[in-house]
Amino acid sequence: PTPIGNLQEMTPRALDILKEVSVIAAEDTRNTKKLLIAYGIDTMLMSHHEHNQQVSIPKIIERLENGEDVAVVSDAGYPLVSDPGQKLVQETILHGFNVVSVSGANAAMNALVASGLSCYHYLFYGFLDNKSSKRKKQLEEIKTIPYTTIFYEAPHRIEDTLQDMLEVLGNRQMCLARELTKVHEEYIRGTIEEVLEVASTCKGEMVIVMDGFKKEEVVFDMYTAITKVDEYVESGMRTKEAIGLVAKEMACKKNELYEAYHKR
């Protein structure tokens, strides 16, 4: 792993490995070159990323077959964790070569332990889809998971993503961590609505740490749900839309509510 913001995050072991291997396969050789120059390392670099892996993987395997050692790095943090590298690891193992991981910086873990939310059980999700409709569907799939969930997000999408989270997950507790280990490192803690109030001013790479689903958040009974559907219908909403909205609000199954509503 390479630094996520602070150059001193490079461990002595990681530096030794970068010095000792025959070649370093880098997501962006320009970024990695700056890191190597800072530490006086002159190991050969080769490009390996999502768009050239069909060519780069066979070259790396060939080097391994010739008895060489190869290090794989991403631009920041761990390779494979929301970064390229999985196919290379799989191919390396299939060809009978050993793969080891080196400890280092990770934005998700930094954000989690400083979030104030539970660290006992957690889910790392990474990036949600950049389209709202698909993003909401992804959130629907995990909204009843009771564990703290960690997402990565880009600054230009942060408001839209938080709005979708508010709509699907409800107004949960969360922490927005940005610019981790850099000069302007910041943790914004509160409900989704509270964080949304300042999200438009936030810049830099971001980590969202979201509280897990809590059963006590939803006190569900079918009578209340049907009553709420009636209220929405009386206000002018179509029945199907009202049932869908109430099902989301009360975390119940839409088909069960639909059946109960029309059988009453």
PLM segments and residue spans:
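A contiguous loop/helix-start segment that scaffolds small-molecule binding in enzyme catalytic cores
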Residues: 148, 155-263
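General beta-strand structural signal in soluble alpha/beta enzymes
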Residues: 26, 101-104, 151, 176
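A charged, well-structured terminal subsegment
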Residues: 63, 133-150
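Conserved helicase motor
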Residues: 47-54, 128-132
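Short glycine-rich anion-binding loops that position phosphate/pyrophosphate groups of nucleotides
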Residues: 4-5, 75-79, 155-157, 213-215
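Short glycine-cluster motifs
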Residues: 65-125, 129
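Short active-site oxyanion
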Residues: 18-24, 96-100, 148-149
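Glycine-rich, flexible N-terminal cofactor/catalytic loop recognition
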Residues: 1-51
